[in-house]
């Protein structure tokens, strides 16, 4: 199967996972291992990756030699805050350029503020960041972000942490069809079938956190999500049969049937 390519780098796994909301770093480690993910996203404002030398660091549980870190701007509500946060991340991670940009509109819905997101993306791309960007499922905004130079566009399936699944597959399909950079569903996945549907639509990957960390058994759910993403990708590549309302053809041979007459 073809690898996922982001900013010129190849990844075998098409599942990206967050690192927040777990009981501790050990549970984080076990869940990430079970997911098979190679890219892990981390909220710079909430997680210790070296800011506090006296506290446990995520870097010890998930060594950068094994995983690609994707610093994100969770908790940022303005372009300026997001830019400042990612500049700090680059310092903490020794010049790391691959980042996830998210600028939120409000604290209740966590819906993206697209105008502020575009403003931040323009600055970050000019500064040499490789920007993977969280956005709405608006195809026009998605295309604008690609044109700015973002290396991946990450439309929501539904609101962050809602677990509502894919609410607007039609808009996602338009984005997938129009963009040339990877399209990664980010936010709203609740269970394995949601991840499979996203991949069957043709998404290049799926990113999730709460769907795994919020499960009764996060490690088992991580394993389920790994399989779901793989199954969805294979189904997309295989090509599904056409949908039919009632003109179905029998799946069993029709020749050589035993006559019903005596």
UniProtKB/Swiss-Prot annotation:
Pathway(s) where this gene product acts: Cofactor biosynthesis; thiamine diphosphate biosynthesis
CDD domains according to UniProt: ThiG (cd04728)
GO molecular function: thiazole synthase activity
Keyword set, alphabetical order: Cytoplasm, Schiff base, Thiamine biosynthesis, Transferase
GO annotation terms (biological process): thiamine diphosphate biosynthetic process
Domain of life: Bacteria
CC terms in the record's Gene Ontology section: cytoplasm
Binding site for 1-deoxy-D-xylulose 5-phosphate: 161, 187-188, 209-210
HAMAP family for the chain: ThiG
Function: Catalyzes the rearrangement of 1-deoxy-D-xylulose 5-phosphate (DXP) to produce the thiazole phosphate moiety of thiamine. Sulfur is provided by the thiocarboxylate moiety of the carrier protein ThiS. In vitro, sulfur can be provided by H(2)S.
Protein name per the record: Thiazole synthase
Lineage of the organism: Bacteria, Pseudomonadati, Pseudomonadota, Betaproteobacteria, Nitrosomonadales
């Amino acid at each position: 199967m073809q690898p996922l390519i982001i900013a010129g780098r190849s990844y075998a796994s098409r599942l990206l996972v967050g690192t927040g909301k777990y009981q501790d770093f050990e549970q984080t480690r076990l869940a990430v291992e079970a997911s098979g993910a190679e890219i892990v996203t981390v909220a710079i404002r909430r997680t210790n990756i070296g800011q506090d030398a006296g506290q446990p660091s995520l870097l010890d549980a998930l060594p950068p030699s094994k995983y690609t870190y994707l610093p994100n701007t969770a908790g940022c509500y303005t372009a300026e805050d997001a830019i400042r946060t990612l500049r700090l991340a680059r310092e903490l991670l020794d010049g790391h350029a691959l980042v996830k940009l998210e600028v939120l509109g409000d604290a209740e819905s966590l819906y993206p503020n697209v105008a502020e997101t575009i403003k931040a993306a323009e600055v970050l791309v000019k500064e040499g960041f490789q920007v993977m960007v969280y956005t709405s499922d608006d195809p026009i905004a998605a295309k604008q972000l690609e044109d700015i130079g973002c290396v991946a566009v990450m439309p929501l399936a539904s609101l962050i942490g809602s677990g509502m699944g894919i609410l607007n597959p039609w808009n996602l399909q338009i984005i997938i069809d129009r963009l040339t950079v990877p399209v990664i569903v980010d936010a709203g996945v609740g269970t394995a079938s949601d991840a499979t549907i996203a991949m069957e639509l043709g998404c290049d990957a799926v990113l999730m956190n709460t769907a795994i960390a919020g499960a009764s058994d996060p490690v088992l759910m991580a394993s389920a999500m790994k399989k779901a993403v793989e199954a969805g990708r294979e189904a997309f590549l295989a090509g599904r049969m056409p949908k039919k309302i009632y003109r179905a053809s029998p799946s069993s041979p029709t020749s050589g049937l035993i006559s019903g007459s005596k």
